[in-house]
Swiss-Prot record:
PROSITE patterns: PEPCASE_1 (PS00781), PEPCASE_2 (PS00393)
Pfam families for the chain: PEPcase
An MF annotation (GO) of this entry: magnesium ion binding
Active site: 138, 594
Catalyzed chemical reaction(s): oxaloacetate + phosphate = phosphoenolpyruvate + hydrogencarbonate
Family matches, as Gene3D superfamilies: Phosphoenolpyruvate/pyruvate domain
Cofactor(s) required for function per UniProt: Mg(2+)
Physiological role: Forms oxaloacetate, a four-carbon dicarboxylic acid source for the tricarboxylic acid cycle.
NCBIfam families registered for this protein in UniProt: PRK00009.1 (NF000584)
Record GO biological process: carbon fixation; oxaloacetate metabolic process; tricarboxylic acid cycle
Record carries keyword Repressor: no
Cited InterPro entries: PEP_COase, PEP_COase_bac/pln-type, PEP_COase_Lys_AS, PEPCASE_His_AS, Pyrv/PenolPyrv_kinase-like_dom
Official protein name in the record: Phosphoenolpyruvate carboxylase
Length: 931
């Protein structure tokens, strides 16, 4: 089932026009800063890049002084940013335009529900489907919050461009405002002077909730219910969308995530959503001026209104306003209690920290309300359900006395939001590496005199010992007075905080704990021991779900055996039963790709889902998958709709979670229109995959799978032969890419590696992919693909036709190849060659020739299977986008190469080193999916 492409004949023309205008204003701002003579050099560089005169471009840039590099780096970093804004505006405009012409245009969701309505269990499907985008703070979001705020203002202005052309908006004022903000952004630091802290990441991601996500999720849920109702399917409390969060709870490899950051993350989230509720109540208060002299109200509404402290004579006859006043005051008191606790012992954070956050998140008028009522000891809501019940009293009174129309709008949206977000906004995941859990459990067992050297036990001995502790002894191991290591204290503190947050904000604030590098059943039991220490798990129930993360090719291959053993235990079945019979499993796209290459990773993940789904069915358990996808193809990225619908049939029961990372968050959720569209696609894709079997012939799919097994084996061998067996590859990567500079870039709180990097396997997947994007090879998204297909076709010429059939009929294979097509189009081997020249020896530089040959072979094979003459034939929008952006951000690669040369030859003063970071930022912005 295809979905509508957002494209029209006017798109390229209008974007070209807008980009021309934005470039003109940027030219003016730049010229004003440096003068006409210096600006001539920028114009020359633009001309050389536009005509693909790489020799002239290289010579011109190498002749620039370090001081001249400053303005050149800034200019060509900001230009791709402005192009992105134009594309985002055009997307938002077309969403609205097409919706106005045809209500069902974006009606991908409408079409999906039409299909589902024909199923016998339609209501059950629609009632229980749940898609969870999980926002993360991996180091791929390179834009500063300040820059994002400025681009948001430019975005809002550019959205009025068509109205300006039509004479509806004053052109002179609009133009002056646009000129002003572009002038400001040209003089604003685009990179961070200091590395982000976890608390910065928390507040940064909250901007997306305030800007778009809360309203988009609420609106989409209401639309979902309405579309189902049109088909005669009346849903009770569906949650097609809920949100997840890693920031503050993901401590895998990040020593800066602690109990305090987990607490802060939960508190800030709570403040953001309660703030939203208070603002909506203000709207309702202003609008609901019904007089008791002109309409009747229910006794329950009168009781609610009479509790208000609003004693104004002007409100005596306005019970709805008084009711909303009381609800608002009670909600503000709830917020204050959450911030500082209802007693000193329950304080979340210090009063100074609370004051800082209030200043950021609470509007001045709400802060005033808080000040007024703080000494009154007003009641607060214990739960979000209590708050909802008060809102329902208002609704019932309106409906009872014929005011149904007043329920629609703000009140209905507010009730809907409370259903979705509660007082917690998004579920925070916890994550830690399995080795840390093992070290902590080993220490606990030793201090309790149970076993001196737990780590030396066999897997069977470990499981027997841990099972006994979990089922037979209710006591905690940490109750002894033995001294604890700093690591153990830190881990126990974060688990204890998790329990406190669940007690205070509700169970859904934290539902999962993910175990990185899960390699055995004991890895999961070790986490259970830690959870038991703070009362989050016992012999009968689990308040937090244990989620294994299978990352490497080997671990994915072993996942079936591991989960078969794990699900065999009666204790585990009890835990799963307390989670509505769901067992979540996380799949790692990044590490499996770095381990075996793109084809091997994709196919291993596909097979693992098939096998794990069957294991769940055999045990009467619903296996749900959490897809740890990044922005790039090398990390599982690509178009979301195609990515989801290409999963194995049956692998999506009714729930799916997936990570949304870095700059992908800005691209997808930077404004409400884009957020609505992208979230709609996630829901539609998930339901489509649940109910639609793309290939109905089982023999055909078996044949396709057998073919893939052979192809992937060859691809994996070719990939590993270069990455792990070639003695010069390690040096090539570190010398012919900006990995060293990427590692020092202040783009996230997490280190680039878990330890000192001495081999490729020790490098985190994100900087690995990020660096290959910077040098424009895009290596993780295609290497090994061409050789594998060539080898298969050489065995039998008829195999090409078989691959072409697979591309046409199998969504998984089609998505796989389409993604390779896309990354090849973003690569540039002329630029990559210049990076290769940075390598110190001929042997190291020669690695590039191996890569280049595979790149050309992969391109030839992809085009042959797709039966296309050129890349991106099926994606004209991306083709057009690259046409007008590549000439500008290609320049940044040449600037970056020259700066790296100067840095490595000690010709770049410390003051100018940050220019490399500016180019990294600009290239990532131009590519739009850096890591």
């Amino acid at each position: 089932m295809s979905h509508p492409k957002l494209e029209s004949s006017s798109n390229k023309e209008i974007i070209t026009e807008e980009v021309g205008l934005l470039k003109q204003l940027l030219d003016e701002a730049t010229q004003k800063l440096i003068g006409s003579e210096s600006f001539d050099k920028i114009e020359k560089i633009v001309s050389l890049s536009s005509t693909d005169d790489y020799t002239g471009l290289k010579e011109t840039i190498s002749a620039l002084s370090n001081e001249e590099m400053v303005i050149v780096s800034r200019y060509f970093s900001i230009l791709p940013l402005l192009i992105n804004i134009s594309e985002d505006v055009d997307l938002a405009y077309e969403i609205n335009y097409k919706n106005n012409l045809n209500q069902d245009y974006l009606g991908k969701l409408s079409t999906t529900i039409d299909v589902v309505a024909g199923h016998e269990n339609a209501k059950d499907i629609l009632e229980h489907v749940n898609v969870v985008p999980v926002l993360t703070a991996h180091p791929t979001q390179v834009q500063r919050k300040t820059v994002l705020e400025l681009t948001s203002k430019i975005h809002d202005l550019l959205r009025k461009y068509r109205d300006v052309k039509a004479g509806i908006v004053n052109q002179e004022k609009w133009y002056a405002d646009l000129r002003r903000y572009i002038g400001i952004i040209m003089q604003t630091d685009t990179i961070r002077e200091k590395k982000l802290k976890v608390k910065n990441e928390i507040t940064n991601v909250m901007e997306y909730y305030n800007r778009s996500l809360i309203k988009a999720v609420t609106k989409l849920t209401a639309e979902y219910k309405a579309l189902a109702a049109k088909k005669g399917i009346h849903l009770e409390n569906p949650k097609p969308l809920t949100m997840g969060m890693w920031i503050g709870g993901d401590r895998d490899g990040n020593p800066f995530v602690t109990a305090e950051t987990l607490r802060l993350s939960a508190m800030v989230q709570s403040e953001v959503i309660i703030n939203h509720y208070i603002e909506q109540l203000n709207e309702l208060y202003r609008n609901m001026s019904l007089s008791i002299n002109l309409t009747e109200v229910s006794p329950e509404l009168v009781t609610l209104a009479n509790q208000s402290q609003d004693n104004s004579v002007y409100r005596e006859n306005e019970p709805y306003r008084k009711a909303f006043n009381f609800i608002q005051d009670k909600l503000v008191q709830t917020l204050l209690n959450l911030k500082v606790g209802s007693s000193p012992k329950e304080k979340f954070v210090s009063r100074q920290e609370s004051s800082d956050i209030v200043g950021r998140y609470i509007k001045s008028h709400i802060a005033q309300v808080a000040s007024d009522i703080q000494t009154e000891e007003l009641p607060a809501y214990a739960t979000a359900e209590e708050f909802k019940q008060d809102l329902l009293l208002v609704k019932q009174s309106l409906v009872q006395y014929g005011q149904d129309s007043l329920v629609d709008g703000e009140l209905a949206c507010l009730i809907q939001a409370v259903d979705i977000f509660g007082f917690y906004l998004a579920t925070i995941d916890m994550r830690q590496d399995s080795s840390i859990n093992e070290a902590c459990v080993a220490e606990l067992l030793k201090s309790a005199n149970i076993v001196d050297d737990y780590s030396s036990l066999s897997e069977e001995e470990k499981c027997q010992l841990l099972l006994k502790e979990l089922t037979e002894d209710p006591r905690t191991l940490s109750s002894t007075h033995a001294p604890k290591s700093e690591l153990l204290q830190k881990e126990l503190a974060i688990f204890q905080t998790a329990r406190e947050l669940k007690d205070q904000l509700g169970e859904d604030i934290i539902n999962q704990h993910i175990i990185s590098h899960t390699e055995s059943v004991s890895d999961m039991f070790e986490l259970a021991i830690m959870l038991k220490e703070v009362g989050l798990i016992d012999a009968n129930q689990a308040r937090i779900q244990i989620v294994p993360l299978f990352e490497t090719i080997e671990d994915l291959d072993n996942s079936r055996d591991i989960m078969t053993q794990y699900l065999h235990y009666e204790l585990v079945k009890k835990w799963i039963a307390t989670n509505n019979n769901y067992q979540e499993i996380m799949l790692g796209y990044s590490d499996s790709n770095k381990d075996g290459g793109y084809l091997s990773s994709g196919w291993t993940l596909y097979k693992a889902q098939n096998e794990l789904t069957k294991i769940g069915e055999e045990n009467g358990i619903k296996i749900t998958f959490f897809h740890g996808r990044g922005g790039t193809v090398g990390r599982g990225g690509g178009p979301s709709y195609e990515a989801i619908t290409s999963q194995p049939f049956g692998s999506i029961k009714d729930r799916i979670r997936l990570t949304e990372q870095g700059e992908i968050i800005e691209n997808k959720y930077g404004n409400q229109d884009a957020a609505y569209y992208n979230l709609e696609m996630l829901i539609s894709a998930s339901i489509d995959r649940m109910v639609t079997r793309m290939i109905t012939n089982p023999n055909e799919i078996d044949n396709f799978r057998e073919t893939m097994d052979g192809i992937v084996s060859e691809s994996n061998a070719v990939y590993r032969n270069l990455v792990f067996d070639n003695p010069y590859f390690y040096d090539y990567f570190f010398e012919a890419s900006p990995i060293k500079e990427v590692s020092s870039l202040n783009i996230g709180s997490r280190p680039a590696a878990r330890k000192t990097i001495t081999e490729i396997s020790g490098l985190r997947a994100i900087p690995w992919v990020f660096s290959w994007s910077q040098n424009r090879i895009m290596f993780p998204g295609w290497y090994g693909v061409g050789s594998a297909f060539k080898h298969f076709i050489e065995q039998d010429e008829a195999n090409l036709a078989k691959l072409q059939t697979m591309y046409q009929k199998w969504p998984f294979f089609n998505s796989l190849l389409s993604n390779v097509d896309m990354v090849l189009s973003k690569s540039n081997m002329n630029i990559a060659l210049q990076y290769a020249q940075l390598a110190g020896s001929k042997e190291v530089r020669d690695v590039f020739n191996i890569i280049l040959n595979e790149w050309q072979l992969t391109k030839d094979m992809i085009l042959a299977i797709e039966q296309h003459d050129n890349l991106l034939e099926e994606n004209p929008m991306l083709h057009a986008s690259l046409d007008y952006r590549l000439p500008y951000f290609n320049v940044l690669n040449y600037v970056q190469i020259e700066l790296i040369k100067r840095l490595r030859s000690n010709q770049l003063d410390e003051d100018y080193e940050k220019l490399i970071h500016i180019t990294i930022n600009g290239i990532a912005t131009g590519l739009r999916n850096s890591g």
